[in-house]
Amino acid sequence: MIIGITGGIASGKSTVVKVIRKAGYQVIDADQVVHDLQEKGGRLYEALREAFGNQILKADGELDRTKLSEMLFSNPDNMATSSAIQNQIIKEELAAKRDHLAQSQAIFFMDIPLLMELGYQDWFDAIWLVYVDAQTQLQRLMARNRLDKGKARQRIASQLPIEEKKPYASLVIDNSGDIAALIKQVQSALLLLANPR
């Protein structure tokens, strides 16, 4: 059984993943996969450098992720170019990791922030959506990424609204409350997985 984890930016997916890992389950983290592919010499690093030139690199040759993010979120054409380049490479890498893990794990998870936006729904037996109301999401993103309201709204707007993700979810984990309530919901869901009714 493969379970997809998704949610809006700053919804609390990382905390959910920590609880799942603590319970002994394997989680493939799409953001980490992307990070690895963007390392100097990686497939995405080379593809992005070819598309946007050396202006997206730091002095030491590493990818300047902050500069790249600013370029993408401020220009829809850049975002479209980047998505076209990256999505296929990422999909291939995630599929390879999924197939490898499926050989040894009966149940595992994949944390994919843009799961619905990029059409990964068919990969999963279940989808867990980490939900947070719009105001809380905005405040958390501004605090976490030190963004002003305008930039935070821009990032949230680049994803499918969380309400539109709900119909795809087999389980909605509500993170509008405190961290203890969030952890309790995840632990209950994991208990049901281990002991299905």
Curated annotation (Swiss-Prot):
User: Which GO molecular-function terms appear in the entry?
Assistant: ATP binding; dephospho-CoA kinase activity
NCBIfam families assigned = dephospho-CoA kinase
Catalytic activity, as annotated: 3'-dephospho-CoA + ATP = ADP + CoA + H(+)
Q: Tell me the residue numbers annotated for binding ATP.
A: 10-15
* Top EC class of this enzyme: transferase
What are its GO cellular component terms? cytoplasm
Where is it localised?
Cytoplasm
In which broad location class does this protein mainly occur, judging by the first location in its UniProt entry? cytoplasm
**Keyword vocabulary terms for this entry:** ATP-binding, Coenzyme A biosynthesis, Cytoplasm, Kinase, Nucleotide-binding, Transferase
Summarizing the function annotation, the protein's role is: Catalyzes the phosphorylation of the 3'-hydroxyl group of dephosphocoenzyme A to form coenzyme A.
Which EC numbers characterise this protein's activity in its record? 2.7.1.24
PROSITE patterns with a match to the protein in the record: DPCK
Family the UniProt entry places it in: Belongs to the CoaE family.
Q: What pathway is this protein a component of?
A: Cofactor biosynthesis; coenzyme A biosynthesis; CoA from (R)-pantothenate: step 5/5
**Annotated DPCK domain residues:** 2-197
- This protein's name: Dephospho-CoA kinase
Q: Which Pfam families does this entry report, sorted A to Z?
A: CoaE (PF01121)
Record GO biological process: coenzyme A biosynthetic process
Native species: Streptococcus pyogenes serotype M1
